[in-house]
């Protein structure tokens, strides 16, 4: 991943053991992504681990603390491609403290039921996040969260 921007994303769920809902965040900017849904998270700062970046970003963006679970890994490669300059790694995360609020970069948050995967797929996701949503739904349906 040398030379690429590294982004950490969180699939915030209501329970790591038996997830029923996923927290989706609607972008307010930049214009090309405004109104589209994504996994909350952000870029790593110099010397920061993916896990530390996730904890920092979720506190800054949503005002929450979480417990991280397993990573939602792609079928090929170490990270999900976002574009030609950036890649993202995503972890399941369980809300520990705080009430999620759209503090930065988002104008709406929504808990999406996971029991019917089609409902999560009806949101207009940022295109690069859609394959991650599909992989997450497959993992939840098969019970492969650990």
Where on the chain are the PLM-derived regions?
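Conserved N-terminal beta-strand and adjoining loop/helix that marks the start
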Residues: 1-22, 43, 74
């Amino acid at each position: 991943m040398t030379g690429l921007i590294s982004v950490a994303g969180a699939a915030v769920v209501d329970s790591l053991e038996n997830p029923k809902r996923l927290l989706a965040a609607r972008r307010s900017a930049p214009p090309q992504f405004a109104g589209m849904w994504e996994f909350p998270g952000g870029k790593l700062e110099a010397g920061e681990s993916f896990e530390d970046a996730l904890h920092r970003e979720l506190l800054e963006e949503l005002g929450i603390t979480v417990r991280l679970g397993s990573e939602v890994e792609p079928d090929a490669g170490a990270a999900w491609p976002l574009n030609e300059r950036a890649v993202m790694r995503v972890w399941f995360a369980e809300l520990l403290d705080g009430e999620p609020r759209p503090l930065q970069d988002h104008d709406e948050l929504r808990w999406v039921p996971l029991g019917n995967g089609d409902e999560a797929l009806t949101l207009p996701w940022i295109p690069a996040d859609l394959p991650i949503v599909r992989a997450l739904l497959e993992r939840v349906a098969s019970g492969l969260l650990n």
